[in-house]
From Swiss-Prot:
<protein>
    <recommendedName>
        <fullName>Ornithine carbamoyltransferase</fullName>
        <ecNumber>2.1.3.3</ecNumber>
    </recommendedName>
</protein>
<dbReference type="GO" id="GO:0006526">
    <property type="term" value="P:L-arginine biosynthetic process"/>
</dbReference>
<dbReference type="Pfam" id="PF02729">
    <property type="entry name" value="OTCace_N"/>
</dbReference>
<dbReference type="GO" id="GO:0042450">
    <property type="term" value="P:arginine biosynthetic process via ornithine"/>
</dbReference>
<feature type="binding site">
    <location>
        <begin position="235"/>
        <end position="236"/>
    </location>
    <ligand>
        <name>L-ornithine</name>
    </ligand>
</feature>
<comment type="similarity">
    <text>Belongs to the aspartate/ornithine carbamoyltransferase superfamily. OTCase family.</text>
</comment>
<comment type="pathway">
    <text>Amino-acid biosynthesis; L-arginine biosynthesis; L-arginine from L-ornithine and carbamoyl phosphate: step 1/3.</text>
</comment>
<dbReference type="Pfam" id="PF00185">
    <property type="entry name" value="OTCace"/>
</dbReference>
<dbReference type="InterPro" id="IPR006131">
    <property type="entry name" value="Asp_carbamoyltransf_Asp/Orn-bd"/>
</dbReference>
<feature type="binding site">
    <location>
        <begin position="57"/>
        <end position="60"/>
    </location>
    <ligand>
        <name>carbamoyl phosphate</name>
    </ligand>
</feature>
<feature type="binding site">
    <location>
        <position position="167"/>
    </location>
    <ligand>
        <name>L-ornithine</name>
    </ligand>
</feature>
<feature type="binding site">
    <location>
        <position position="108"/>
    </location>
    <ligand>
        <name>carbamoyl phosphate</name>
    </ligand>
</feature>
<keyword id="KW-0028">Amino-acid biosynthesis</keyword>
<feature type="binding site">
    <location>
        <position position="300"/>
    </location>
    <ligand>
        <name>carbamoyl phosphate</name>
    </ligand>
</feature>
<dbReference type="InterPro" id="IPR002292">
    <property type="entry name" value="Orn/put_carbamltrans"/>
</dbReference>
<dbReference type="GO" id="GO:0016597">
    <property type="term" value="F:amino acid binding"/>
</dbReference>
<dbReference type="InterPro" id="IPR006130">
    <property type="entry name" value="Asp/Orn_carbamoylTrfase"/>
</dbReference>
């Protein structure tokens, strides 16, 4: 099928079909090869990207800014201290002004409602660089990394360990369901996936001959896993809950024993970063031969560039 995504925003992968995600991954492969050969095509020459950050960032800022600059574009960093973002001026009005002056907007912050309003009122493509609910650009990089390792996505088993209701787990669950993969959320009952998103992903999985499930049982979750994935136990804004989370999530630490429980020496370990080594994952695993976290981090740039190419050109 012919895919045309020009003018689209990326707010959540729930808005994208399997074919559209496949299209983005194919572009990602192409731009990664270009990057390796130092090819610069200046696709975004004369364009401006506004990057709004309510939350700190390493990978997201670097990925968007370098991806846009490599193609000849100009990226502007904006913090809440730099612009009116719902204070003294409505969010709707800020979005309208931005839309008259830039070609695209990236937002990384707290409320999903904020990125949705930016998309509704700006009239230009808006990219979700992370909200409390979703992290779609991370999920695209995850898919790219998995496919690079296994040569396919269909049928790959992915186990997310720990806080399975956080934004990274949620977006990865959506991505796996869309692409025909088998996703297992493994963690305590108190931190199980959001019921509405979980049920929607199960519906999608039935359509793609995949599966989406939750369990607190490590043996059940890990048997035959191709990918073991985890994230920090206390996300940004939840630092006050860290002690409680450590107690709750300690049984779900990814360590050598957990990796061996898959029964597959080719199982890979993934983490969106930043990581608290010795907490959600041991130093031995994240620095070991099964770890793909640095490939995963690099792939943020290539998949983000692909999203911008698909929606701006």
């Amino acid at each position: 099928m012919s895919v045309n995504m020009k003018g689209r925003s990326l707010l959540t992968l729930l808005d994208f079909s399997s074919e559209e995600i496949r299209y983005l991954l194919d572009i990602s492969k192409q731009v990664k090869m270009e990057s390796r050969s130092r090819l610069r095509t200046e696709r975004f020459k004369g364009m401006t990207l506004a990057m709004i950050f309510e939350k700190r960032s390493t990978r997201t800022r670097l990925a968007f800014e370098t991806a846009f600059a490599e193609e000849g574009g100009h990226a502007i960093f904006l913090s809440p201290n730099d612009i009116h973002l719902g204070t003294k001026e409505s969010l709707e009005d800020t979005a309208r002004v931005l839309g008259r002056m830039v070609d695209a907007i990236m937002f990384r912050g707290y409320k999903q409602e904020t990125v949705e309003k930016l998309a509704e009122y700006s009239g230009v493509p808006v990219y979700n660089g992370l909200t409390d609910d979703f992290h779609p650009t991370q999920a695209l990089a995850d898919l790219m990394t998995i496919e690079e390792n296994f040569g396919r996505l269909k049928g790959v088993k992915v186990v997310f360990m720990g806080d399975t209701r956080n934004n990274v787990a949620t977006s990865l669950m959506i991505a796996c369901a869309k692409m025909g993969m088998n996703f297992v959320a493994c963690g305590p009952e108190e931190l199980k996936p959001r019921p509405d998103i979980f049920e929607r992903c199960q519906e999608i999985a039935r359509e793609t001959s995949a599966s989406v499930s939750f369990t607190s049982n490590l043996e059940e979750a890990l048997a035959g896993a191709d990918v073991v994935y985890t994230d920090v136990w206390a996300s940004m804004g939840e630092e006050d809950k860290e002690k409680e989370r450590i107690s709750l999530l300690k049984p779900y630490q990814v360590n050598k024993r957990v990796m061996e429980m898959t029964g597959k020496p080719e199982t890979i370990f993934m983490h969106c970063l930043p990581a608290v080594k010795g907490q959600e994952v041991t130093y031995e695993v994240i620095e070991g031969k099964q770890s793909r976290v640095w490939d995963e981090a690099e792939n943020r740039k290539h998949t983000i560039k692909a999203v911008m190419i698909a929606t701006l050109l």
